[in-house]
Amino acid sequence: MSTELSVIESRIRNAGELANVDEELVELIVKPIRVLEMSLILRHDDGRHSLFSAWRAHHSDVLAVDGMKGGFRISPDVNRDETVALSAGMTLKTALVGLPLGGAKGGICADPKTLTSREVDRLVRLYARELNPH
């Protein structure tokens, strides 16, 4: 488990304890309800193919009435734990401002600086197609 993820889980547990929230409810909030892991095969402009790892984390829908909120990023540093940690952060942000939304976040592990704009477009579309049934 990454440092970011362990820190945010620890903070949620501490806040739950301070607020005297039932431990079972705290655990429902701590863990993501769904993490989708994808392998995206991109066809480059020159005909080569590359494999990219990608994730989408739906953190918590305990307070959600209207679905999930959260974007995605493309970076060579993206990984599963970071994606889950960022989705947890989004859950907390929406709760703090009173939005009836759970937190979500997504990411593609790729360096967009090494891709053409058409390749980035294709990669994002591949990602979106993989998410469509979910």
Predicted regions and their residues:
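N-terminal ligand-binding/catalytic initiation module
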Residues: 1-134
